[in-house]
C-alpha cells in the first residue's frame, strides 16, 4: 500500500475527483480527513470508506474560510495523530462569461475558491507537515490557464495559473524541510464541473475530441495521478505542474 499509516486531508471530497481520491487513498492505507461543503454527500463518502475497513472522518465546511482550513488540520491531529499531506482539490468553474461581462463579485468568488483557499489551506497544513518531518501537498489545477484556455474561462484560467505560482513558491520555501508541493492539471473529467458533458452526448463528444485520447477522463484516473504525487513514488518530484489531461494540451485536431 502506497500510503500505509499516512494521514491525508482531501478537500472537494464529496464527489468527483475528490471522492475518488478519498476511496483510493484509503485503500492504499491512508487515514483521510474529508472536507467539502455538502454535508450529506461527504458523510456518504466517509461511511463508504469506513464500511470497507478504511479510516475516514468527514468535516463539512467552506475552504474559503481560514478557520475551516485550521479545523481540518486539527481534526487530522486529534483523530489520527498528525498530518502527512493533503490533496487540496476544491474548485469552482464560474459562469462562463466573457471577461468584459464578468461581474467583479464572480471574479472574487472564483479566485477565493480556487486560489485564495489554496493559500489558506497551505498556511494551516505546512506547520503540521514540518512538525512531522515533511510531506506532500497536491493542488488541483487545470490545463486551462497553463497550456490552453477557452472562451468564457477568464476567472478560472487566472485562478489556476496563479495556483501554479503558489505551488512553486511553497516548493522552494519548504523543500529543505521535507515538504513537496505539486499542482495536478487534469483535462476534461466526467464530474459535475464538466457541465453539459455529463448529460449531453453531443457536448461529451465535442469535449472528448479536444483530447489526443479522444475521450474524457474518469475521476478515478485523475485520483491515480494524485496518489502518485502523494506517495514516495514521487519522492523527488516537487514544484511541478503535472498534466493528466489525455493529451488535451498537445491536440490540435
List each language-model region with its residue ranges:
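Conserved glycine-rich cofactor-binding loop
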Residues: 14-15
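Conserved glycine-rich Rossmann-like NAD(P)H-binding loop of the short-chain dehydrogenase/reductase
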Residues: 28-44
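Short C-terminal tail/terminal secondary-structure segment
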Residues: 93-96, 227, 238-253
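Substrate-binding pocket helix/loop in short-chain dehydrogenase/reductase
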Residues: 97-99, 103-111, 207
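Active-site helix of classical SDR
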Residues: 122, 159, 167
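Alpha-helical segment proximal to the catalytic Tyr-Lys
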Residues: 127, 172-173, 235
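Short, small/polar-rich loop/turn modules that mediate ligand/substrate recognition or access, typified
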Residues: 175, 180, 237-239
Amino acid at each position: 500500500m502506497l500510503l500505509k499509516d499516512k494521514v491525508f486531508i482531501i478537500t472537494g471530497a464529496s464527489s468527483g475527483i475528490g471522492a475518488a481520491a478519498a476511496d483510493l487513498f484509503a485503500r492504499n492505507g491512508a487515514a483521510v480527513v474529508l472536507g467539502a461543503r455538502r454535508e450529506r454527500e461527504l458523510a456518504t463518502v466517509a461511511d463508504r470508506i469506513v464500511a470497507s475497513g478504511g479510516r475516514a472522518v468527514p468535516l463539512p465546511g467552506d475552504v474559503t474560510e481560514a478557520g475551516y482550513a485550521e479545523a481540518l488540520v486539527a481534526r487530522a491531529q486529534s483523530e489520527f495523530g498528525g498530518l502527512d499531506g493533503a490533496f487540496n482539490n476544491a474548485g469552482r468553474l464560474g459562469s462562463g462569461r466573457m471577461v468584459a461581462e464578468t461581474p467583479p463579485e464572480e471574479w472574487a468568488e472564483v479566485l477565493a475558491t480556487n486560489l485564495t483557499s489554496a493559500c489558506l489551506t497551505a498556511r494551516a497544513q505546512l506547520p503540521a507537515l514540518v512538525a512531522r518531518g515533511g510531506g506532500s501537498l497536491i493542488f488541483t489545477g487545470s490545463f486551462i490557464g497553463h497550456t490552453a484556455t477557452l472562451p468564457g474561462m477568464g476567472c478560472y484560467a487566472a485562478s489556476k495559473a496563479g495556483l501554479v505560482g503558489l505551488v512553486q513558491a511553497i516548493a522552494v520555501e519548504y523543500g529543505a524541510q521535507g515538504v513537496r508541493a505539486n499542482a495536478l492539471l487534469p483535462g476534461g473529467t466526467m464530474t459535475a464541473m464538466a457541465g453539459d458533458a455529463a448529460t449531453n452526448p453531443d457536448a461529451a463528444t465535442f469535449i472528448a475530441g479536444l483530447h489526443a485520447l479522444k475521450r474524457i477522463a474518469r475521476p478515478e484516473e485523475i485520483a491515480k495521478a494524485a496518489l502518485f504525487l502523494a506517495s514516495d513514488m514521487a519522492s523527488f518530484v516537487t514544484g511541478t505542474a503535472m498534466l493528466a489531461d489525455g493529451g488535451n494540451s498537445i491536440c490540435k485536431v
